[in-house]
Amino acid sequence: MATAVGGGSDVEVGFAKLQGEDFEYYMQSYSIILGRNSKKATVDVDLSSLGGGMNISRNHARIFYDFTRRRFSLEVLGKNGCLVEGVLHLPGNPNVKLDSQDLLQIGDKEFYFLLPVRSILGGPLGPRHHVSGQTSVVPYHNYQSGPGSGSGKKGVRSRELYEYDDEDDDDDDDEEDDMRGSGKKTRRDGHEVVYASGEKKREGRSKVDREADDQQFLQLEEKDVVSSVATVLSDLCGPGEWMPMEKLHSVILKEYGNVWHHSRVRRYLSQEDWAIPEAKGKPWYGLLMLLRKYPEHFVINTRSKGRVTLEFVSLVTLLS
């Protein structure tokens, strides 16, 4: 199976997972672009290389977490549109709410959008509508089963056995709630469903678990930012070359300023969170502090001109 792991990491964790017949992608950032790579730009998921056919635009669709509505959504960008559960959505239409196990088709490529069942830390995934703010999105592993689980049949429509954990479904009745707590099996829409054992109504996770999840989230966010910086430096710098932090900040801001969540932009691309003299006039200060945490990947060089200190950065691989 061809594997595309999000965020430049080979760790199988993320906020959500895309599962096709011959590929999987772990979403490790707030927003990803699906489409096809070109000479000038790359996308997070290159569906053209995965057999998506000729009707895929460079930037065909965007899957992102909508913090206002606390849910994942699909924005259609490509002129040929996207199918979600058999319904065609075109550019200019309202963004599409994505539920776990929704079947998407872009071009000739079909795949499922899956949300996790359990947290990285082993605890149950609490009700999503009880969590607020940035921590609405926490990285998880152990996803609901993708296409063709245990069936051996060709094609992504052969989903059979999976765990069902769509707690945003307002149509669940009392009988289903009882089964959620008992660990029993029932059938839903012609498919066998396995409910995980646990409390009938989950009351959310402990403060310690939430803090641990927050820390895990920040680590994944750091990896995503570091991966983005490394990509920019490798594309724009040759062997032995350095890039001024001011220029790096400008490139990153242009490339990701409208893609990253505003809290990430504020943390790494502005000086709002850094009320200290050293950060004055340096909106890249947060980014600089992050890169200093990874000396195995980045080399920071400083030069002073009077009272002004200039920072330059390069990749270890470009200087070795």
From Swiss-Prot:
The family database entries (CDD domains) matched by this protein are listed as: FHA_FKH1-like (cd22701)
GO CC, sorted alphabetically, is: Isw1 complex; nucleus
User: Which keywords are on file for this protein?
Assistant: Acetylation, Developmental protein, Nucleus
Query: Where does this protein come from, organism-wise?
Result: Arabidopsis thaliana
* Protein origin, superkingdom: Eukaryota
Give the region (Disordered) as residue ranges: 138-211
Spans of biased composition, class Basic and acidic residues?
A: 198-210
Q: What happens when the gene is disrupted?
A: Slightly enlarged leaves, small siliques with few seed set, severely reduced fertility mainly due to reduced stamen filament elongation and defects in pollen development. Increased polyploidy levels in cotyledon and leaf cells.
Q: Which InterPro entries match?
A: FHA_dom, Fhl1/FHA1, SMAD_FHA_dom_sf
Protein's gene: FHA2
**Residue span, FHA domain:** 32-89
Q: What is this protein called?
A: FHA domain-containing protein FHA2
Tissue distribution is:
Widely expressed.
Residue numbers carrying N-acetylalanine: 2
